[in-house]
């Protein structure tokens, strides 16, 4: 099923630690027409995360049943957990003329581009691999093994950057935010 819509689908992808989630939050604050897509996941909630605001938390069985019912626009298994985008919520926002912002990986981006119209895909690169590793270490949320896994995943993720409409290096947060917002505004004008 192809989703046709009145709003734009804006995809932000990047390796973990590149600033994608912070950029997404900042975009939502400066653009009243943007809404964040809320994913479903089988991972455990982190401290402060709220059901229906940060994620829809599902058991593995619940998630697999939703997959069987074709309720996801896209889904993937990442680090032993499932993540997916519920179709119904996205369609509701798009039909209201709102743009939906996705904070997802390359697999999800590829699936959405295949199943929806008016998609703008933006890939965010770190200034360098060394800076990316430093950012991950500075977070102090992962052990050494997890950091190595994230770095391997980052290399894989970055190998797909050429599949995106735009590629931006996040070496200055405010400038990167400005560039992304300018892209969104320009794409709105092209689409309608």
Curated annotation (Swiss-Prot):
What CDD domains does the record tag this protein with? GMPK (cd00071)
Q: Which keywords does UniProt give here? A: ATP-binding, Cytoplasm, Kinase, Nucleotide-binding, Transferase
Query: What EC number(s) has UniProt assigned to this enzyme?
Result: 2.7.4.8
The record lists the catalysed reaction(s) as: GMP + ATP = GDP + ADP
Which GO terms fall under molecular function for this chain's record? Answer: ATP binding; guanylate kinase activity
Q: What does the entry list under GO cellular component?
A: cytosol
* Family from the record: Belongs to the guanylate kinase family.
Q: Specify the protein name.
A: Guanylate kinase
